[in-house]
Amino acid sequence: MSGAGSAGMARGLRVDGLPPLPKSLSGLLHSAAGGAAGGWRHLERLYAQKSRIQDELNRGGAGGGGARAAGMRTKPPNLDAALALLRKEMVGLRQLDMTLLCQLYGLYESIQEYKGACQAASSLDCNYALENGFFDDDEDFQEQGSLRDGQGRGSPGDPSLPLTHLSSSDWILESI
C-alpha cells in the first residue's frame, strides 16, 4: 500500500479521546489496511500469543531460582543488572500497552458495528411505520381524517360550498 493510503488509514483510525497510533506501529497500519474487518482482533490474538511465549521463556530462564529472582528485583547488585531489569520491565509494559491498544481499537470497531446495526434497525422500523400508517394516536388520526374528508366533500350544513342538483340525465352525461 502506498504512503498516502497508509496516511489515510492512520487518519481513519483516529478517534476522539484516543491517541493516534505511534509512527513505530506503521507495520500494524499496513497489516490492518488489508481490508479485514477483524484486523485489530487478529493482532490482539497475535500479541496475546507472543506474551504467553515470552512469559514461558521468562519462567524457564529462572529455572527454579525464584527466590534469587525475587531478591534480584528488590535490589540489583550493579548498574548493568538494574538496566537489564529495567529493559525487561519495559518490554513487558510495551507488550501490555500493545495488548490494551488492540483491545481498545477492537472494542471501538465493535461499538461502531453495533451503532450501525442499531441505526439501520431504527431507520427500517421508522420507514415501516410511516409506510404502513402506524401511529401512536391511530384512533385520533382516523377521526381527524374522517372529519376532514367530510368537509372536503361538502356536507349539507356547509354554506361555503355551492350545492348543485343534477337530474338523472345530467348525472349520466357528467359521468361520461
Curated annotation (Swiss-Prot):
Ranges where the record places region Disordered: 140-165
UniProt similarity note: Belongs to the FAM89 family.
PANTHER family (UniProt xref): LEUCINE REPEAT ADAPTER PROTEIN 25, PROTEIN FAM89A
Name used for this protein in its record: Protein FAM89A
Organism: Rattus norvegicus (Rat)
